[in-house]
A protein has these predicted regions:
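Core dinuclear metal-dependent hydrolase active-site scaffold
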Residues: 1-50, 128-187, 257-263
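Active-site neighborhood of phospho(di)ester-bond hydrolases with catalytic His/Asp-centered motifs
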Residues: 34-38, 55-63, 103, 176-180, ...
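Active-site metal-binding motif and surrounding structural segment of the metallo-beta-lactamase
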Residues: 40-96, 194
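Structured loop/turn residues at beta-strand edges in well-structured enzyme cores
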Residues: 50-53, 96, 124-126, 142-144, ...
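A short alpha->loop->secondary-structure connector
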Residues: 53, 82, 117-129
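Extended hydrophobic secondary-structure segments that form protein cores and membrane-embedded regions
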Residues: 60, 90-105, 129-132
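A short helix->loop->beta-strand "cap" motif at the edges of active sites that frequently abuts
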Residues: 81, 87-90, 94-98, 217-224, ...
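Binuclear metal-ion centers of metallo-dependent hydrolases, dominated by the metallo-beta-lactamase
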Residues: 185-197, 205-263
Length: 263
């Protein structure tokens, strides 16, 4: 079973009560894997019962602030809890490697420099393996395989230097597609076929248009999960959900902060 928790369901809008910037995680066999790290993601996760010390990897779709604004604080909280839990925390994290996949390593270098100016110079007893995202397989462990597929949400300044990616995750016999921010749902090909969950966004799209895209293409899929939602959806939640269900039936979730579900 894969357990999902939504830490932030909001697009990069100005602050909206009860809706933080985009972040969610998957728990597989006791390990935690993150998709994006928007503001306050560690705070939300911890208070929602997610074990931060079980973090194995963090996958960033692209380096906009609404997707990385909480990244430094996430690592800070992991270190903090390592000490709060004393001997148990130290033992759990000793020699552990946390993987970070992010297309713009400059962002990570800046965040790390900031962390090194905090308590104890950010001395840690675990390793952070930061590597760039590129097309193809970017991560593999005993629980999952993750492949990246570039999209044109961010246009490269240099040919081929893509900074925005969608992810396909195979875990526990399931297929999950995380679109991230995307200009055109068609641009990453037929990766959606056979997916059990497809995380889609309405920060740049309308609910009915997204649903109709998948219906018209005829993809076989389990459920659409709307994250990175704009004000139109957040302010009109029930109406948006009704619209989606009128098109795809019960095969839809419009996420809210703190929401949990399993696959």
């Amino acid at each position: 079973m894969i357990n999902f928790t939504i830490h932030g369901s909001c697009a990069g809008t100005s602050p909206i009560p009860g809706a933080r910037h985009t972040s969610y995680c998957m728990e597989v066999n006791g390990s935690v894997y993150w998709i994006d790290a928007g503001e306050n993601c560690a705070y939300s996760a911890h208070l929602n019962g997610v074990d931060l010390l079980a973090t194995r990897a963090i996958f960033i779709t692209h380096p906009h602030m609404d997707h990385i604004g909480g990244l430094g604080n996430l690592f800070w909280n992991i270190r903090k809890l390592t000490y709060v839990y004393k001997d148990e925390g130290m033992a759990r994290m000793e020699g552990k490697t946390l993987s970070l996949r992010i297309s713009e390593l400059r962002s990570w270098h800046g965040i790390y420099e900031m962390l090194c100016c905090t308590e104890g110079d950010f001395g840690i007893n675990f390793t952070i393996d930061a590597a760039p995202v590129m097309d193809g397989e970017i991560f593999r462990d005993e629980n999952m395989v993750v492949t990246a597929h570039h999209n044109s949400h961010l246009i490269p300044k240099t040919e081929g230097d893509w900074k925005s990616y969608s992810f396909v995750i195979h875990a526990d016999g399931k297929k999950i597609v995380c679109c991230g921010d995307i200009r055109d749902y068609a641009e990453i090909g037929d990766v959606y076929e056979g997916a059990d969950l497809i995380f889609v966004e309405t920060g740049h799209h309308k609910v009915d248009a997204v649903c109709n895209f998948f219906l018209e293409k005829g993809y076989n899929f389990g459920k659409l999960v709307f994250v990175h939602n704009g004000r139109r959806v957040i302010d009109n939640y029930e109406e948006s959900l009704e619209t989606a269900k009128s098109l795809v039936g019960d095969r839809v979730i419009i996420s809210r902060d703190g929401m949990k579900f399993s696959l």
